[in-house]
C-alpha cells in the first residue's frame, strides 16, 4: 500500500514539474491518434491527387483520339485504303508516321495513361482488308476503361474492349459485319453491323457490364 502511495506521489510530482517547465509530453495513445489522423489525411490527399491526374489524362486522351481520327481520315480516306498494320509494331509506326507527316504532334499521338504512342491498326470492312482503322488506348484500369468509353464513345461508330495491355488485328473483327453485344461488357460493344446491341448508357445492364474482366484493358476506337 505504501509503495502505491509513493508511485502516485512521484507521478503527481512529475506532472506538476512538466506543467511548470512546459515539457508536458504526449501519451502513447495520443501519439497513435495523431498518427492515425495523419494517415487518413495523407490517404485523402493521395486519392484526390490520383483523381486529378486521371481527369487530366482522360481529357488529354479524348483530345488525342479526336486529333488522330481527323488526321487518319484526312490523310488516307481519299486513297481508298489505310496502311496495312500486321502487328503492334506496325500500329505504332503508323501513329509515328502521322507525326512525321506533320498531321499530329508527338504529344497528340501519345496514350496519356502510359506515355507511349497509341497504336493505330487498319482492319477489314465487309471483308475488304484495310478499309477501316482503329486507334487503341491500352494499359487502362477498369475505372479508366469505363470512363474513357463513356466519355468519347459518341465520337466513334466502332468500339472494341479487350482484356490485356495491348490489342492485335485479330481482336478487332470487321468494321461493318462484327455484331456488337454491349451486354457482354467486352469485345465489340458498338458497331454499324445490322442487329447490333450497341452500348446504351440508359441500359443498366450495359453500364454494369462495361469493361468486364481483369485489368489492364485496351479499348479500340474505330472509323472508316
UniProtKB/Swiss-Prot annotation:
Effect of residue 29 to M: Loss of autoagglutination and pili
GO biological process: protein secretion by the type II secretion system
Alphabetically ordered keywords of this record: Disulfide bond, Fimbrium, Membrane, Methylation, Transmembrane, Transmembrane helix
Coiled coil regions, renumbered to chain: none
Presence of keyword Protease: no
Bilayer topology: Single-pass membrane protein
Residues modified to N-methylmethionine: 26
Location relative to the cell: Fimbrium; Membrane
Propeptide: 1-25
GO CC annotations on file: extracellular organelle; membrane; pilus; type II protein secretion system complex
Effect of residue 45 to T: Loss of autoagglutination but pili remain intact
Consequence of gene loss (knockout): Deletion mutation abolishes Vibrio cholerae colonizing capacity. It also shows loss of observable pili.
Gene3D superfamilies, per database record: TcpA-like pilin
Induction record: By ToxT that is required for tcpA transcriptional activation. Mechanistically, interacts directly with the tcpA promoter to mediate activation.
InterPro entries per UniProt: N_methyl_site (IPR012902), Pilin-like (IPR045584), TcpA (IPR010271)
NCBIfam families: IV_pilin_GFxxxE
UniProt function note: Major component of the toxin co-regulated pilus (tcp) which is a type IV pilus essential for bacterial aggregation and subsequent colonization in the host small intestine.
Domain notes: The leader sequence region and some other sequence particularities suggest that TcpA may represent a novel class of pilin, and imply the existence of a novel signal peptidase.
Designated name of the protein: Toxin coregulated pilin
Source organism phylogeny: Bacteria, Pseudomonadati, Pseudomonadota, Gammaproteobacteria, Vibrionales
The gene coding this protein: tcpA
Amino acid at each position: 500500500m505504501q509503495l502505491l502511495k509513493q508511485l502516485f506521489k512521484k507521478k503527481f510530482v512529475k506532472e506538476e514539474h512538466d506543467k511548470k517547465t512546459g515539457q508536458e509530453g504526449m501519451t502513447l495513445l495520443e501519439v497513435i491518434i495523431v498518427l492515425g489522423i495523419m494517415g487518413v489525411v495523407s490517404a485523402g490527399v493521395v486519392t484526390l491527387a490520383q483523381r486529378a491526374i486521371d481527369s487530366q489524362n482522360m481529357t488529354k486522351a479524348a483530345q488525342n483520339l479526336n486529333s488522330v481520327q481527323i488526321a487518319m481520315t484526312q490523310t488516307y480516306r481519299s486513297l481508298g485504303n489505310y496502311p496495312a498494320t500486321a502487328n503492334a509494331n506496325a500500329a505504332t509506326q503508323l501513329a509515328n508516321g502521322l507525326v512525321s507527316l506533320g498531321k499530329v504532334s508527338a504529344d497528340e499521338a501519345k496514350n496519356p495513361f502510359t506515355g507511349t504512342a497509341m497504336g493505330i491498326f487498319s482492319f477489314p470492312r465487309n471483308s475488304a482488308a484495310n478499309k477501316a482503322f482503329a486507334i487503341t488506348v491500352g494499359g487502362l484500369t477498369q475505372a479508366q476503361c469505363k470512363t474513357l468509353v463513356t466519355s468519347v464513345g459518341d465520337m466513334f461508330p466502332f468500339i472494341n474492349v479487350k482484356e490485356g495491355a495491348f490489342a492485335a488485328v485479330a481482336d478487332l473483327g470487321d468494321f461493318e459485319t462484327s455484331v456488337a453485344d454491349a451486354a457482354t461488357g467486352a469485345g465489340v460493344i458498338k458497331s454499324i453491323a445490322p442487329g447490333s446491341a450497341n452500348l446504351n448508357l440508359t441500359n443498366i445492364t450495359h453500364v454494369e457490364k462495361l469493361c468486364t474482366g481483369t485489368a489492364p484493358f485496351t479499348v479500340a476506337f474505330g472509323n472508316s
